[in-house]
Amino acid sequence: MFALVDCNSFYASCERVFRPDLKNKPVVVLSNNDGCVVALSKEAKNLGIKMCDPWFKIEKEYKQKGGIAFSSNYELYADISSRIMDILEQLSPRVEIYSIDEAFLDLSGVSNCLDLDIFGRDCLETIKKWTGMPVRVGIGPTKTLAKVASFGAKKYPQTNGVVDLSSKDRQIKLMKLMPVEEVWGVGRKIHRHLNGIGIKNAYELSQLDLNFIRSKFNIVLAKTVRELRGEVCIDLEEEAPTKKQIVVSRTFNSRITNLKMLHEAVSDYAARALSLIHI
């Protein structure tokens, strides 16, 4: 069994740690020179704010609606991330740091002596108590199913941030509710091709013939399908392999024609990529 621990609105939540009065209020984080939005809370999204929105265009209306903005502080974010990962390494013997705000845990020993839902809630509460950071926990027999569980924990508030997919019935139920483009490893191009053959959700993807997947797509997607069926194909990487490249990217909401705005975004994502080197 695996758990995926994922921080909620990581950058915005880091800022809220020191400003508890901002709980449930719109928060955005701006690029290095306050040029555009690079992270935002759920409440800010509900106001219609989007990633890479130019700050000068939205500042007045956003502040009128009670929104708060912070300049990005990558040293702070890296420090809080390190604290969270240290906690996770105390809770599980094997941890894979997947990104600055995500980690996979090996629960093979835990599942023999503790209810996994209880473990997930203990994990959530411990991180909240020791760091002030909100997280969600997805639990499943494979890393891909743990990702599915994390999707459920984010999508459905009634889960209170923890979803355990030990049960096959629960796996099927949630996969039927999960759009195929949300599946870990399904990129935009593959998503379009899958939609073209009538595959709309994760469960429909899991039922495709593996030979068909290998011939029409690739072996990576075939592994994803096998993982959705509960077969472990992707093990934990406790020591990350040497990377030939580090990519941090986002899709702009509209065509960017302002060179200053483009420079702001490139500078910010370069800083994010650099922060990954130190994790």
Which residue ranges define each predicted feature?
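Gly/Gly-Pro- and Ser/Thr-rich, intrinsically disordered tail segments characteristic of DNA damage-repair
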Residues: 1-226
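DNA-contacting surface of Y-family translesion DNA polymerases
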Residues: 190, 195-277
